[in-house]
Amino acid sequence: MNIVDNSWIKLPRNFVNWSWYHDANMVQLYLYLLLNANVYDVKYNDITIKRGECLVSLNHLSKETGISLQKLRTGLARLQRTKEIEYKKLQNGRIIVLVDFKKFQPI
């Protein structure tokens, strides 16, 4: 993952109307993904991780957020079901695609 220290995300005020807003784990998970998504395409071990995507392992994600593995799996499944993320499983993790990344990180 490449995070540019001086980059930022735009968080619209209507985020408080988001269906998962009152679930602290979901908010923390989604904000973690937003803040750690690539701001430009990057090659990593012959895999291109595009803008709006982040490479994570569930174990690392659990350590970083303090959310249990089971709650992470549930949260990711919910975000996928509501079409807010897509993900591709890899041998050592997964690439999470934030579907509306452009809304939060304008060019």
PLM segments and residue spans:
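Short recognition helix of helix-turn-helix/winged-helix DNA-binding domains
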Residues: 1-60
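Winged helix-turn-helix DNA-binding recognition segment
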Residues: 37-97
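Short, amphipathic alpha-helical interaction segments positioned at domain boundaries
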Residues: 102-107
